[in-house]
């Protein structure tokens, strides 16, 4: 039953407005001869999948209304009596039925990104005992760490096209289950030999590569513009909390059960998420039969038109300077971010002389700071937009913080000898970096909402190239140079990105 509500009344004329066929029996004709009843009876039935709200309203002669409402789930019925208004909207649904569906989608995307980084950073910790067991040198470690990005690079644009044409639900679901299987297979591949491990890590990148374009496609359809920064900040904070969770639990699991346990336990969580995703999510509000009319109207009034994409206007997209600003700044941003993501535990272990457990636990703080800062930045950005600041200025302010903050704090690492201050500097660097979620990471939906998946695929391809080159280059730099050289390159790219972003970016829609 697709109708949201069914209205029945003892007034025969109202039957013709309730989607019921006219009654032609003799019993119905006899109803017209009945004297008006002093009480009017109305019934609303609200079907919600396997549950319903059933309410009977009775109006007395003094025009007050009493009611008895029932919540039905399976064979269980519960009810209550009260006095209500003359509107179906006064029906009180259980809290889990009233929770905005768009935020259910956001939370599911958040949890997917939580798993994404849990499965990605576990290698950053496990690589330490694995290197000792298999005798890998820093160059080999850099090769293993960068192999993830080989597959990740392949599916950025393809994932965006796929999401924009067939819907983000299928694409994100595919990505999560694919990378979860690859995670589980990692210990087996490592035992078989280095080539097998490189292939499995690349396969894992294939799955994670479609996640960001698919998520961007889904949220561009579900989230109103005034909630865009907050929703994206929450989803991306899932990545940071995934790093926190992975870095915190990996040392414990390795210590108790050995390094393979990290991959088996983290990878198995993907099946739990997939079950919830398939039952609760839809690619678009138009495909969701359980969406309440009020929320459907809110989304329709405040989201860009999302007609099905049949072809991608590549020439138009690539002719726009703000698109190239987005692509180049994504490269500048991700160089430093991915180096810290993959090499931070090694930095703590080699430079700051922390043991395995300490390296994992202390690596948590920068990512925890990012999770907090990303959500704070999202709230600040949406507040500024609601108070009349242009989207362009808000995006430039937030991304400038996201570039200059990390540049400043990474520069300070050269002058710090205290391990405590080094960890604090790293946390501040990552915390200011998180303001980028309300800058360049929100900009795809600003400038090309219909093609946001493809556009994110384009810019993130540049970001992944930065990850591949930066992660592999760091291994070679450390064989012949120092960590100061690694950080200097990152700072230089942050400064270049700041200039490009403030000269060429915009928050206005430039592609319909």
Swiss-Prot record:
Recorded GO CC terms: chloroplast thylakoid membrane; thylakoid
Protein name: Sodium-dependent phosphate transport protein 1, chloroplastic
Keyword annotations: Chloroplast, Ion transport, Membrane, Plastid, Sodium, Sodium transport, Symport, Thylakoid, Transit peptide, Transmembrane, Transmembrane helix, Transport
Listed Pfam families: MFS_1
Domain of life where this protein originates: Eukaryota
Record membrane topology: Multi-pass membrane protein
Known function: Specific for inorganic phosphate transport across the thylakoid membrane in a sodium dependent manner. Binds glutamate but cannot transport it. May act as an ascorbate transporter at the thylakoid membrane.
Location in or out of the cell: Plastid, Chloroplast thylakoid membrane
Residue span of the annotated presequence: 1-59
GO annotation terms (biological process): response to light stimulus; response to nematode; sodium ion transport
Entries under InterPro entries matching the protein: MFS, MFS_dom, MFS_Na/Anion_cotransporter, MFS_trans_sf, SLC17A9-like
Main subcellular location: plastid
Tissue and organ expression note: Expressed in flower buds, sepals of mature flowers and mature leaves, less in senescent leaves and at low levels in roots.
Family membership: Belongs to the major facilitator superfamily. Sodium/anion cotransporter (TC 2.A.1.14) family.
Tagged with keyword Zinc-finger: no
Organism of derivation: Arabidopsis thaliana
């Amino acid at each position: 039953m697709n109708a949201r509500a069914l209205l029945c009344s003892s007034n025969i004329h109202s039957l013709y407005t309730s989607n019921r066929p006219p009654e032609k029996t003799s019993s119905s004709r006899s109803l017209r001869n009945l004297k008006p009843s002093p009480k009017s009876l109305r019934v609303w039935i609200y079907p919600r999948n396997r549950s319903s709200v059933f309410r009977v309203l009775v109006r007395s002669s003094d025009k007050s209304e009493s009611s008895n409402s029932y919540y039905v789930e399976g064979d269980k019925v519960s009810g209550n009596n009260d006095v209500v208004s003359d509107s179906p909207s006064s029906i009180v649904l259980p809290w889990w039925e009233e929770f905005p569906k768009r935020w259910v989608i956001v939370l599911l995307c958040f949890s997917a990104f939580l798993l994404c980084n849990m499965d990605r950073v576990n290698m950053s910790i496990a690589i330490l005992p694995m290197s000792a067991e298999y005798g890998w040198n820093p160059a080999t470690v850099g090769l293993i760490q960068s192999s993830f990005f080989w597959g990740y690079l392949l599916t950025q644009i393809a994932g965006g096209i796929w999401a924009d044409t067939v819907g983000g639900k299928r694409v994100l679901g595919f990505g999560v289950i694919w990378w979860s299987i690859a995670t589980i297979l990692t210990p087996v591949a490592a035992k078989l030999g280095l080539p097998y491990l490189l292939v499995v890590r690349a396969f894992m990148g294939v799955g994670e590569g479609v996640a960001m374009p698919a998520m961007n496609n889904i949220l561009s359809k579900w989230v109103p513009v005034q909630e865009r920064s907050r929703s994206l900040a929450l989803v991306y904070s899932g990545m940071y909390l995934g790093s926190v969770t992975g870095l915190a639990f990996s040392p414990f699991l390795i210590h108790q059960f050995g390094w393979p346990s990290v991959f088996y336990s983290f990878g198995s969580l993907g099946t739990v998420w997939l079950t919830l995703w398939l039952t609760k999510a839809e690619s678009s509000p138009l495909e969701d039969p359980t969406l309440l009319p009020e929320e459907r109207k809110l989304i329709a009034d405040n989201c860009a038109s999302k007609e099905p994409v049949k072809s991608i206007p590549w020439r138009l997209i690539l002719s726009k300077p703000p698109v190239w600003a987005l692509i180049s700044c994504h490269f500048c941003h991700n160089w430093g971010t991915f180096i810290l993501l993959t090499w931070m535990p090694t930095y703590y272990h080699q430079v700051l002389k922390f043991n395995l457990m300490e390296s994992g636990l202390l690596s948590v703080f920068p990512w925890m700071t990012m999770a907090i800062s990303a959500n704070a930045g999202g709230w600040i950005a949406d507040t500024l937009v609601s108070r009349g600041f242009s989207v362009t200025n808000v995006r430039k302010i937030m991304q400038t913080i996201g570039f200059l903050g990390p540049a400043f704090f990474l520069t300070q690492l050269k002058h710090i000898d205290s391990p405590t201050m080094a960890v604090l500097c790293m946390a501040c660097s990552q915390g200011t970096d998180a303001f980028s979620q309300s800058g360049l990471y929100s900009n795809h939906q600003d400038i090309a909402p219909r093609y946001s998946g493809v556009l994110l695929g384009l810019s993130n391809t540049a970001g992944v190239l930065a990850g591949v080159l930066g992660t592999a280059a760091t291994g070679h730099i450390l064989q012949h140079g120092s960590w100061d050289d690694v950080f200097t390159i990152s700072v230089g790219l942050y400064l270049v990105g700041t200039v490009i972003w403030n000269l060429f970016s915009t928050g206005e829609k430039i592609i319909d």
